[in-house]
Amino acid sequence: MTTAEAAAPESRTFEADVAKLLHLMVHSVYSDKDVFLRELISNAADACEKLRYEAITTPALLGEDARPRITLAIDAEGGRLTVEDNGIGMSRDEMVEALGTIARSGTKAFMERIEAAAGGEKAELIGQFGVGFYSAFMVAEKVDVISRRAGADTANIWSSDGKGAYTVGEIDVAQAPARGTRVVLHLNEDGKAYADRFRIERIVKEQSGHVPVPIYIVEKLDAEPEEIADGVALWTKSKSDISAEDYADFYRSVAGQFDQPALTVHFRAEGRHEYTALVFVPSTKPFDLFEPERTGRVKLYVKRVFITDDAELLPRYLRFVRGVVDSADLPLNLSREMLQDSAILAAIRKGVTGRVLTELEKLAQSDAEAYAGIWSNFGAVLKEGLYEDYERRAQLLNLARFKTTTSGTAADTGWRTLKDYVADLKENQTAIYYITGDLARVEHAPQLEGFRARGVEVLLLPDQVDSFWVTAGVDYEGKPFKSVTQGAADLSLIPLPKSDEAETPEPEAKDTGDFIAFVKETLGDQVADVRASDRLTTSAVCLVAPESGIDRRLEKLLASAGRLGDAAKPVLEINPRHPLVAALAAHGASDSNFRADAAHLLLDQARVLDGDQPSDPQAFAERLMRVMQRGLPTA
């Protein structure tokens, strides 16, 4: 494109210390050069909105070109990129006012005038500050702005290299748009990478694809413009006008996934803060769900212009949710990448979080199978909220689903809720019992035997986060959570079925007491205590944490992360009714070496059952060999 020489163009200097401000903006305010295009498109969309508003009272301004549009023209050979709109345009004085002063935005002044005239009713305009336009100098060594105001007979050109001065003057209307503004970027060496159709189209679709004006691209001189954005944002439509397939297509585009959404949440919040949210729960688990740096993937828009996907619009325990939130009244500071009013953002975060959880509750009640699929994929993440979000803990507990000793662990078996669990409490049961660890192991843990024998249901908690949230003072309907691997089992008030009580004879109390005392003395400081167990029915031994200690699995997790000093000594529980223990107790003290070997082997057996190894494999092997030899006939 060429521009006519302006007759006696007037040279001016910017009213602010532009060189310093431009340097700060280019090198500090914007962390991503791509935003220049977003800013220019936003300005163009504002110009179209201004024209629409003024045409309400002056329809002749539209002429024969009533449909708004934004056109991007690429001149790779000439190293130029042009952004043109058919909006309201600018007069010479408006150019000087809007472009000659940093941080004096024509859009902001226009909004103030509109609000004053309309009693505070807001016009839907994007720009709030006057520096967005100047982001063009990140990629351009010179910028020409050619504009013809709607209804005017003259056109003007503004030119600057962004170094402190600019020129402004009249231009032949034949060299200007029929109406609106044309911004011509003479790209610098780094900026020439933007004279590329695919790069421009990608940026438009990522950041400006939902502005309320169609966007076209012209790749070559005299080529027909191609539409690359239709000016429609799906979330602005009424839900009744959107099909399930429309939602699914939008989900795939915004989430970058190929599955169907398991849950769609679309709502508009009105009141003190107005915003629209359209978010989705995926039906498949993202591969990076548990990456340490994984954050939310909800995109923040302001008036349909993409701002960031790093605004933490949802808590970390909802980081699997994808979608968009669009605010019409969220203020922005100098850069649209930095949010100015955290109080508004906090209100949006609270509202969207609450609505997502409420919709999950509704789905759980109306379609248990569909909700079970969501829980299977994301339950381990949702449970992080039980530890982190005290305010919503009760709601999250109602959303939680569990495999238990009653339900079984197979994938196709049902899930249990805490409401189900509490409804089935046994007589005299005062706690909600749980065990943490890998399902394949804990399902057969010896610590469960006494609970199973009494029909007491135990939650099976396989995820690492389970070891943390259960220690956070959580209760449900007044019932505390209690680990079956910590402290005393307290099962004496929950009787065994009559048949089980009759099957196992009581051992001699004195023999058992003497043997337990011997084992405790023999093991010394390897254990905190040795005691008779009321939680074991078929196994001989098990390990539990002391009452004042921490859960065994949590202790292992902290130790593996280097966040635990000296580990607490475990308690060894011995089943006095087990035939092996009864035989050892009745053996007497005549062969102390044999009984000492047996005591150590019982501890090592308990360690193995707990998923550990013998503390001294060499000593374990020697003791095992001696005990086996003792049972063989002498040659």
Curated annotation (Swiss-Prot):
Keywords: ATP-binding, Chaperone, Cytoplasm, Nucleotide-binding, Stress response. GO terms for cellular component: cytoplasm. Its main location: cytoplasm. It comes from the Bacteria. The keyword Kinase does not apply. Pfam families: HATPase_c_3, HSP90. GO terms for molecular function: ATP binding; ATP hydrolysis activity; ATP-dependent protein folding chaperone; unfolded protein binding. PROSITE patterns: HSP90 (PS00298). Homodimer. PANTHER family: HEAT SHOCK PROTEIN 90 FAMILY MEMBER (PTHR11528). This is Chaperone protein HtpG. It comes from Azorhizobium caulinodans (strain ATCC 43989 / DSM 5975 / JCM 20966 / LMG 6465 / NBRC 14845 / NCIMB 13405 / ORS 571).
